[in-house]
């Protein structure tokens, strides 16, 4: 429980950066930790639930316990705002979000909810990358838009997501519906053409990943299911027509575990990447027993949710390392979070992922972090691993004057691969995996030669972390990446040489010009969402601007929910059936909150 509450401290500040309780900030939260860890996490106090048990509670249950329950007297000097923040993090969403997110409260229910007869009868954007290669490239036929159409795009409808502040879940388009979710844990099925709402579903916690849809077997009347994960490590299958839960599986018990990358389906399996917030909690603490989380990929039976295999990026389980001067037990190895959606290569029975940094130093350096890894889709066996940045051991808050014994002696640069590898075939018949790293370097690895480096290209003059975060898109000739320093770059797939660069200036005073959200491509054009709330389109030929839209401007929502746009920093736009969709609102770092889904078409 002690280390769990320190995770809580960090994540409260991450998720609620503008909350009024920040006047008290760390002092009150650390005081809470000091009062509670003498019981929670103490084996001698058997009646006090540990961190894993607390993580299973709803935010309403946590809030009730600390306001009117058995421990409320111990927290009598903690403000109600802080209690709600604490309950919201432990529960993974806002208190009472379920009461607010119900589609029945909206003013625009769809007049009919027809059965889904086929997923191939209408254009779709399924999951994170639109197809198994994660190229984020929509074909001309499926897009229904040309580069010439882009300047004529107009807002068709806007939809507000109640109780949401971050538009985490990238819109999925299938069967004439839009499936989307947010930090509230609310999931919605919306009519693609009109924005009317079919149904809502309330997850246990916030949903940060794109939704995947596929046929499901052996589940009675349910013929198609939507799949997604939450920030408590749960994975769900929900009836795509009715919104009723079919199954739920917890793929990781670690209190800091979350599903960030979108699960991806193939045949009867669902492949789920697992990430963590542990690296953001441990570095600034002198009492956290760092560190025990290991990134993983789990293969589930898509029909039942049963786990088939699970592969950890770091194969060795954490063991006690040493104790600090104050007696805190430290652990390791740890790290290797998977922030991205797996790329599938069924012809070679391979799954490809980008891996995150290590959290702990080890006698023998970890070889599987900060790189690209191939895993057998059938068995979970690691086929090969190519590490691009060795010895990257990083925890948030380390460096400078920080003397926490959790911090590595040699703090690493934090050069995770946050984005999915893109599988492309070259004219000469060779295949490459194109992967953008946080240091602004794009790598091409050969999947057929144990991940050997084909080429690498540095996109910026000064290497710092966070240059490329959630990745690019690729057509047959080039890959396109947005940069957090401002700008879009085209890189030739054949040799890694830069084709063009277009700088971007912020459209909003006081807002950054960063382009951290994933890029989306159609033939002749790419789309990029910016920290300033501007959605932009560029020509793939030379990078000249084609169109832009300020998502922070005031709009009227079709469902009657008050909503506003904000920053765009992770999920990218999606395109299908002549329409463009994007969520606006992203708060990590210096981003602005938002709860708005926007749909555009040529009118």
Please tell me what each predicted stretch does.
Residues 18-32, 103-107, 111-112:
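Electrostatic cytochrome c docking/interface patches
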Residues 26-33, 37-74:
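Gly/Gly-Pro-rich "capping" loops immediately C-terminal to redox-active cysteine motifs
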Residues 74-102:
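C-terminal capping alpha-helices of c-type cytochrome domains
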Residues 1-3:
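N-terminal secretory signal peptides that target proteins for export/translocation
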């Amino acid at each position: 429980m002690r280390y769990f509450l320190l995770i809580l401290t960090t994540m409260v500040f991450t998720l609620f950066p503008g909350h009024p309780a920040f006047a008290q900030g760390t002092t009150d939260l650390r005081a809470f930790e000091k009062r509670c860890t003498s019981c929670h996490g103490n084996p001698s106090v058997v009646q006090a639930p540990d961190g894993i048990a607390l993580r299973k509670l709803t935010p309403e249950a946590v809030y009730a316990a600390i306001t009117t329950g058995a421990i409320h007297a111990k927290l009598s000097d903690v403000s109600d705002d802080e209690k709600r923040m604490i309950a919201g993090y432990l529960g993974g969403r806002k208190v009472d979000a379920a009461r607010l997110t119900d589609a029945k409260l909206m003013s625009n229910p769809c007049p009919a909810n027809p059965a889904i007869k086929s997923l191939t009868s209408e254009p779709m954007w399924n999951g994170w990358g639109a197809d198994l290669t994660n190229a984020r490239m929509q074909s001309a036929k499926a897009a229904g838009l040309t580069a010439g159409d882009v300047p004529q795009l107009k807002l068709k409808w806007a939809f507000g997501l109640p109780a949401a502040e971050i538009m985490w879940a990238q819109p999925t388009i299938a069967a004439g519906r839009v499936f989307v979710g947010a930090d509230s844990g609310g999931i919605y099925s919306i009519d693609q053409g009109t924005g009317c709402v079919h149904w809502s579903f309330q997850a246990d916690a916030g949903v940060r990943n794109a939704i995947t849809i596929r046929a499901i077997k052996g589940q009675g009347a349910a013929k198609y299911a939507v799949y997604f994960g939450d920030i408590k490590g749960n994975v769900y299958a929900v009836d795509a027509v009715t919104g009723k839960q079919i199954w739920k599986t917890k793929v990781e018990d670690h209190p800091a575990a979350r599903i960030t990358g979108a699960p991806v389906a193939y045949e009867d399996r669902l492949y789920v990447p697992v990430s963590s917030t542990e690296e953001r909690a441990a570095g600034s603490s002198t009492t956290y027993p760092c560190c025990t989380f290991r990134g993983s990929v789990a293969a589930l039976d898509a029909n039942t949710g049963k786990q088939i295999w699970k592969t950890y990026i770091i194969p060795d389980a954490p063991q006690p390392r040493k104790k600090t001067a104050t007696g805190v037990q430290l652990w390791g190895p740890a790290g290797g979070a998977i922030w991205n959606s797996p790329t599938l290569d069924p012809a070679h029975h391979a799954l490809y992922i980008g891996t995150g940094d290590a959290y702990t130093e080890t006698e023998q350096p970890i070889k599987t972090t900060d790189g690209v890894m191939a895993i057998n889709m059938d068995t979970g066996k690691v086929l090969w691993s190519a590490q691009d940045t060795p010895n990257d051991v990083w925890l948030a808050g380390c460096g400078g004057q920080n003397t926490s014994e959790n911090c590595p002696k040699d703090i690493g640069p934090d050069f995770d691969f946050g984005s999915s590898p893109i599988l492309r075939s070259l004219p000469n018949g060779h295949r490459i995996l194109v992967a953008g790293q946080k240091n602004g370097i794009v790598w091409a690895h050969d999947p057929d030669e144990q991940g050997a480096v084909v080429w690498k290209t540095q996109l910026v003059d000064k290497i710092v972390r966070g240059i490329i975060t959630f990745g690019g898109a690729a057509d047959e000739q080039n890959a396109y990446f947005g940069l957090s320093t401002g700008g879009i770059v085209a890189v030739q797939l054949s040799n890694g040489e830069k084709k063009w660069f277009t700088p971007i200036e912020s459209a909003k005073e006081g807002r950054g010009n960063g382009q951290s959200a994933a890029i989306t491509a159609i033939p002749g054009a790419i789309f990029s969402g910016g920290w300033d709330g501007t959605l932009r389109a560029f020509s793939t030929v030379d990078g000249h601007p084609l169109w832009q839209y300020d998502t922070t401007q005031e709009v009227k929502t079709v469902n009657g929910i008050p909503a506003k746009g904000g920053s765009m920093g992770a999920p990218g736009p999606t395109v299908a059936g002549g329409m463009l969709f994007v969520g606006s609102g992203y708060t990590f770092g210096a981003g602005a909150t938002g709860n708005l889904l926007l749909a555009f078409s040529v009118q």
